[in-house]
Amino acid sequence: MAGAKEIRTQIKSIKNTQKITKAMEMVAASKMRKAQDRMLATRPYAEKIRQVIGHVAMAKAEYKHPYLEEREVKRVGMIIISTDRGLCGGLNINLFKKAVLAMREWHDKGVEVDLCLVGNKALGFFKRLGGNVVGKVNQLGDQPRMNDLIGTIKVMLDAYDEGRIDRLVLVENEFVNTMTQKPRATTLLPLVPSEEDELKHHWDYIYEPDAKPVLDTLLTRYIESVVYQGVVENVACEMAARMVAMKSASDNAGDLIKELQLVYNKARQAAITQEISEIVSGAAAV
């Protein structure tokens, strides 16, 4: 058994760590509420543009935009949104598992995958994995801006326009609630409506002055908005996961302190008993 002094030092060290985790928990809780507000503020625009794009995808326009046409998949582009920092539980690991599983499925079909990475954690992980990284952006902070993402998104859109990739997939975290964040993979390009949507569709758009410039701008804005929404939502996921992880760490530290306090009391009691025994033995010898 360790001595009372060593145990006391351990208890002090754990208490200091507990103070840090509690502070991080409170900071994450505060930032999470702000991140949720930003996420909710961006959703109406994202949902509306998704609705418009859904209608456009079903329209029978004379000009068929390349983003609306499905083609044989020889190479896939994948945008993966992670965090810049750790200490957020299994948020990034679960996301990477989802991405790696999707990559393996494509590789099994003989399809190569190009990666565009958002966040330091994804960059570090997929570089170690040996992934083909063609674009990256990090250090977006707790209040990401669209302008910081446009250059990275353009790399993938240019690759799609030039035929270097035939499908664009977004891998992100979905904010379900404070306790639950789920990784998901969504196909961004091509935009192909389902058969059910086509059966419900009974109208069309008239484009002025011309369909091409309207669709070029609208579809690009759509992709940018979806990726930006994913980044904003990922910040909320990060803060929620960090808050839960730090609360768990604080609770575990409290349990460990209680256990060490019990061990300390036993060690102190044993030392006192030994001292009394030595005093009694000495008195008897005299």
Curated annotation (Swiss-Prot):
GO terms for cellular component: plasma membrane; proton-transporting ATP synthase complex. It is a peripheral membrane protein. It comes from the Bacteria. InterPro entries: ATP_synth_F1_ATPase_gsu, ATP_synth_F1_gsu, ATP_synth_F1_gsu_CS. Coiled coil: none annotated. Keywords: ATP synthesis, Cell inner membrane, Cell membrane, CF(1), Hydrogen ion transport, Ion transport, Membrane, Transport. The keyword Endoplasmic reticulum does not apply. GO terms for molecular function: ATP binding; proton-transporting ATP synthase activity, rotational mechanism. GO terms for biological process: proton motive force-driven plasma membrane ATP synthesis. It is found in: Cell inner membrane. PROSITE patterns: ATPASE_GAMMA. NCBIfam families: ATPsyn_F1gamma, PRK05621.1-1. F-type ATPases have 2 components, CF(1) - the catalytic core - and CF(0) - the membrane proton channel. CF(1) has five subunits: alpha(3), beta(3), gamma(1), delta(1), epsilon(1). CF(0) has three main subunits: a, b and c. Belongs to the ATPase gamma chain family. Produces ATP from ADP in the presence of a proton gradient across the membrane. The gamma chain is believed to be important in regulating ATPase activity and the flow of protons through the CF(0) complex. This is ATP synthase gamma chain. It comes from Thioalkalivibrio sulfidiphilus (strain HL-EbGR7).
